[in-house]
A protein has these predicted regions:
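Bacterial Sec-dependent N-terminal signal peptides
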Residues: 1-24
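Polar low-complexity intrinsically disordered regions
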Residues: 21-30, 39-40, 44, 88, ...
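Thiol-based oxidoreductase modules, predominantly thioredoxin-like and allied folds used
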Residues: 23-28, 66-89
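Local sequence-structure signature of Cys/Sec-based thiol-disulfide redox active-site neighborhoods
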Residues: 27-67
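Loop/turn elements at helix/coil->beta-strand transitions in domains of secreted/extracellular proteins
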Residues: 40-44, 75-78, 102, 110-113
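Solvent-exposed loop/turn segments at secondary-structure junctions
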Residues: 50-54, 84-88, 112-113, 121-124
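Non-catalytic, surface beta->alpha helical segment in thiol-disulfide oxidoreductase systems
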Residues: 100-140
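Oxidative protein folding and maturation machinery
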Residues: 148-390
């Protein structure tokens, strides 16, 4: 009996140990880990993460405990992780490793060279696959950089180098420009060249982007109109997003004007939405209202939330009758698309400001009815009805 109990306890102990296993992250700084790598020959696996990142949390709690994952990473790497919510660490490493999203996994050798970089949330098998790829010199950044630098006009060398950089979301524009220059700024219109440009060009204000735009029809023949226009849209979005978010209006309007020259409706729609955000952030209400009046019907007519937002801004910041009428039209359209409480309330408010009492009453009543369906507080709509005499 005692022997059976002992065996049972041993089984539970082994099982607990198995489930508790995970990647063994060493309590080392990156600098000390690199020194250790130089001594042992094991590369460093540096995980840059944020403790509030859900993708990071999922990797830590669900992927790292996988036996296949932990066995491989513990056997082949010196593993460390650093929380980029620590502002000192963030300042030190974000620019150095071009960190733009988390988690990012960086493989570094004992000479402090970045060998490989990969980004995001992975399933266990794919995470091990990335680790195996990182250990093969043929897939490493230094190998592919040297091959490209030896023959910068070669499309295969360029593509392979870009592929290694793209895995880690590293900068690629300079590679595209070097390839373009090495080919005397005249690229053949081939699938391989489109693939290279599509994965590398990111600057609207670059000679190579202007070349792509000038030869849009030629590239559409080897790719497709949809793919080419999608690339132009993503490039515009990339260039507008950062200055708009940081409120760098000088660079925003510089890139905005370049984006407008592309002449694609999907980019014009993006420009309108971003313009409105920038104008609102800077309380430039005349510019906001003018942009909304000239573009909302064309680009946002099926976007209920945007139309309601515009209507609310017009209600708050305009007393011009024709502008208020326009704002009311946006609110009504919003309520048609989504007959929700706040959309109807927007229409009721702006009609009340215009003195169109019957219409204000109608939309206030509709707002109350929709609000009651969801047990919402309808006090604002009730107040409008009271002021209109019920």
């Amino acid at each position: 009996m005692f022997r059976n109990i002992t065996l049972l306890l041993t089984f539970f102990a082994l099982t607990s140990s198995l489930f508790a296993q995970s990647i063994n992250f060493q309590p080392l700084s990156l600098e000390d880990a690199i020194i250790e790598s130089g001594k042992t020959g094991k590369p460093v696996m540096f995980m840059a993460y944020q403790s509030t990142c859900t993708h990071c949390e999922k990797m830590i709690n669900e992927v790292f405990p996988d036996t296949m994952v932990s066995n491989f990473y513990n056997a082949n790497f010196i593993n460390i992780r650093i929380d980029m919510l620590d502002q000192v660490m963030a300042k030190k490493y974000i620019q150095q490793f071009y960190l733009s999203s988390f988690p990012t996994f960086i493989i570094i050798n004992g000479k402090a060279e970045t060998l490989y970089q990969y980004v995001g949330e992975f399933k266990a098998a794919e995470f091990v696959k990335q680790a195996k790829l990182s250990l093969d010199p043929a897939n490493q950044i230094p190998t592919n950089r040297r091959a490209f630098e030896a023959n910068p006009a070669d499309s295969t060398a360029c593509y392979n180098y870009l592929l290694t950089l793209s895995r880690g979301r590293l900068a690629t524009q300079s590679v595209a420009s070097a390839y373009f220059n090495a080919n005397n700024k005249q690229l053949e219109f081939t699938t391989s060249n489109w693939r290279i440009l599509s994965m590398s060009v990111s600057n609207l204000d670059s000679e190579i982007f202007r070349y792509m735009l000038e030869h849009k029809a030629d590239f559409e023949k080897v790719a497709s109109t949809k793919k080419v226009e999608r690339k132009f849209y993503l490039t515009a979005a990339y260039n507008l997003q950062t200055p708009a978010t940081t409120n760098d209006t000088t660079n925003y309007f510089r890139y905005r004007n370049l984006a407008a020259k592309v002449g694609l409706p999907i980019i014009d729609s993006l420009i309108l939405v971003t313009d409105l955000s920038v104008y609102e952030k800077n309380k430039q209400w005349d510019a906001y209202i003018q942009a909304a009046k000239s573009g909302a019907e064309k680009y946002l007519w099926n976007d209920a939330n945007s139309l309601r937002r515009i209507s609310d801004m017009i209600y708050e910041h305009s007393s011009d009758k024709s502008t208020l009428v326009k704002g009311a039209n946006f609110a009504v359209r919003s309520a048609e698309l989504k007959p929700e409480y706040f959309n109807n309330l927007s229409a009721a408010k702006i009609y009340f400001k215009l003195g169109y009492n019957d219409l204000s009453k109608k939309y206030a009543q509709q707002a109350i009815a929709e609000g009651k369906k969801k047990n919402m507080n309808t006090v604002e709509a009730n107040k409008i009805l009271e002021e209109l005499g019920g």
